[in-house]
Amino acid sequence: MCPVAVLVMGVATGAGCRRVAGENDAVDVTYAASLTVAMANVASRFREQTGREVRGDPRGSVAGAHLIREGVWRPDVYITADPATLPLLGDHDPGWAIVFARGELVLGYGDASRHLAALDSAKAGLLRWPDVVLRPGFRLGRTDPDLDPKGYRAIFAFRLAEELYGPRGLAARILSEPSGERSVFPEEHLSARVLTGSLDAAVFYLAEASQQGLRHVPLPRPLNQGDPADAAALARLEYRTSDGRLFRAAPIAYAATVPLNSPDPRAGAELIAFLVGEDGNAVLEESGFVTGGTVLGDVSRVPALLLDVVAAGDVADGRVRRSPRAAPVDTTPGPSGPTGSPPP
């Protein structure tokens, strides 16, 4: 069975996995739930320009890749919060993707938090945030690291915090769940729990927290995993999922591709072209994202429509840079080797 399409713009209809090319004018997208607000804005602008609706399925990027791999969901575009999830598409991995935005981690919190004053003090630099989240009764939320990159990035941040602040065992204490309390929730539900006060704070991307109207405590480098200059410092950290897949820490990046089982690959390419173009960049920047990136994988497999846009962007403003046969995403010995290789 197929998941219900979540409305991004236009009328939500049945599952996209049964759609065939030409059946309607909608573009189906499975995207990282942290992009929910930004994708609504993208969909609105895309519709104005093309007349086409965008139907979205927001969820953790690992979970979304599994649904596509298993044929449960057949979107025209897959957008991930970590390029390392691309090999999880299996036989539907086209062997290329375009990185179009970057982000960083923060601790997001709302007015309903029981520890509002302490969090405000941490935001102002008057208290250390680990001391705040370890207070008795503090409820810190995060996403499932087996389903969502933000989940394993939170673990990386806590491990780095232990190295920066000490003492030994700090990360384990932050990750521990008090008796009868849950700390791990689906990405698409996390902000609502923070806004209502059922969680005092949670790990978010900066743009995501801003879009949801949350306050935030900034995290220092490299804990925030937002600066490409920290790639080497992050690469030594890794997380192994319950099914044995290994993900390594890397600067946060969003990437988009057209799965090989897309019913309408041209529609998918058109939406990605919009994302990496001037108008798409403007929408993303208005939503708080840092735009720019590169082609990952085999450039020869990238649709000509996209190569035209990427090349134009490189010449015009440098937002997206095209490189001949760019280096593939290295997740070895994780989901698999280069983009385009299915996991075992």
PLM regions: where:
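Bacterial N-terminal signal peptides
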Residues: 2-12
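Short acidic/histidine-rich motifs immediately flanking catalytic phosphotransfer sites
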Residues: 73-75
